[in-house]
From Swiss-Prot:
The gene is ruvB. SUPFAM superfamilies: P-loop containing nucleoside triphosphate hydrolases, Winged helix' DNA-binding domain. ATP binds at L24, R25, G66, K69, T70, S71, E132, D133, Y134, R175, Y185, R222. It catalyses: ATP + H2O = ADP + phosphate + H(+). It is an enzyme of class 3 (hydrolase). This is Holliday junction branch migration complex subunit RuvB.
Length: 342
């Protein structure tokens, strides 16, 4: 039987994962692992707003997917003692979709919009007066006889999450007084996250097993938890129920996640740049066509890790394979130097 591995290390949430993520999600700032500076800052902002009895200023959270932006929004709502209303940019198709959400907000509630960079222009424009003046303008009629009716809104907090800050229009981005960027996690932080999650799942875990899983989780908590789930399955069926280094190695080998945390799609991307396009530079659309994936998915999901780990470079002329990519795939670099298969 062939295991299909391509989706196991994507930091995007997979279908059916939301329920598990909610059960493992940190409940308070003290439970939240990593992003120390951001958590410390946001904790102060939330405490000050609560003491003054005011709504928190609007917050923009950016960074690669799977790093805990949604978890921070949930914690903020809990710390402020308000209700969190969750939606996403693609879900807000018409102004009416936004109006329904905004008019349902109680004082100081939080509206969380994931993938806020994907808002339609019409919805984005309607959001501006809501953020600044806490009003929503409704146009009645059409043409010369059209009239604008102003609907007053309760003072609320908008928390926007984005993986691509550059796609946000400047007028929208500038309306967020609080802007924080989440960064990839270190192995020690991911190990702590894995150990805590294993404890909640009732899974005994060895120190070296947790360390190995964390080392190969691409700096992303969501991936660490996903790999932990799969390792739990192998520990239960093919082991003694304990998460050991051997179980983690076996699990990731079956999922085709290599020793550096690269999966099959990562290797296909690097191979395409090197073998098909001579190492680059090559445009992202050409790479996407070569590997059979959408260019936006490559930019959001795969490239950040490959760039951060030194396998790929983004240049004004396109993507370029770096020496580490040649070495990892065992390819000869231009100039004749032999790579070594890692």
């Amino acid at each position: 039987m062939t295991v299909k591995p391509l989706r196991d290390v994507t930091p995007k949430p997979l279908e059916g994962e939301e329920r598990l993520e909610q059960s493992l999600r940190p409940a308070t700032f003290d439970d939240y692992v990593g992003q120390v500076k951001i958590v410390d800052n946001v904790k102060v902002y939330a405490a000050a707003a609560r003491q003054r009895g005011e709504s928190l200023d609007h917050v923009l959270l950016s960074g690669p997917p799977g790093l805990g932006k949604t978890s921070l929004a949930h914690i903020l709502a809990r710390e402020l003692g308000v209700t969190l209303h969750v939606t996403s940019g693609p879900a807000l198709v018409k102004k009416g979709d936004l109006a329904g959400l905004l008019t349902a907000l109680a004082p100081r509630d939080i509206l969380f919009i994931d993938e806020i960079h994907r808002l339609s222009p019409a919805v984005e424009e309607a959001l501006y007066p809501a953020m600044e003046d806490y009003r929503f303008d409704v146009v009645l009629g059409a043409g010369l006889g059209a009239q604008t009716m102003e609907m007053k809104l309760e003072r609320f907090t908008l928390v926007g999450a984005t993986t691509r800050t550059g796609l946000l229009a400047s007028p929208l981005r500038d309306r967020f007084p609080i802007q924080e960027r989440l960064e990839y996690y270190g192995p020690a932080e991911l190990k702590e996250i894995a150990v805590r999650a294993a404890r909640k799942l009732g899974l005994p875990v060895d120190e070296d097993g947790a360390e190995e899983l964390a080392r190969r989780a691409r700096g992303t908590p969501r991936i660490a938890i996903r790999l932990l789930q799969r390792a739990r399955d192998f520990a239960q069926v093919e082991g003694d129920g304990r998460l050991t280094r051997e179980v983690v190695d076996r699990t990731l080998r079956r999922l085709e996640v290599d020793a550096r945390g690269l999966d099959a799609m990562d290797r296909r991307i690097l191979a395409a740049v090197i073998d098909t396009f001579g190492g680059g530079p090559v445009g992202i659309d050409a790479v996407a066509a070569a590997v059979g994936e959408e260019s936006g998915t490559l930019e959001d999901v795969y490239e950040p890790f490959l760039v951060r780990e030194g396998y790929l470079a983004r240049t004004p002329r396109g993507r370029v394979a770096l020496p580490a990519a040649y070495a990892h795939l065992g390819r000869d670099r231009p100039g004749g130097k032999q790579g070594s298969l890692v």
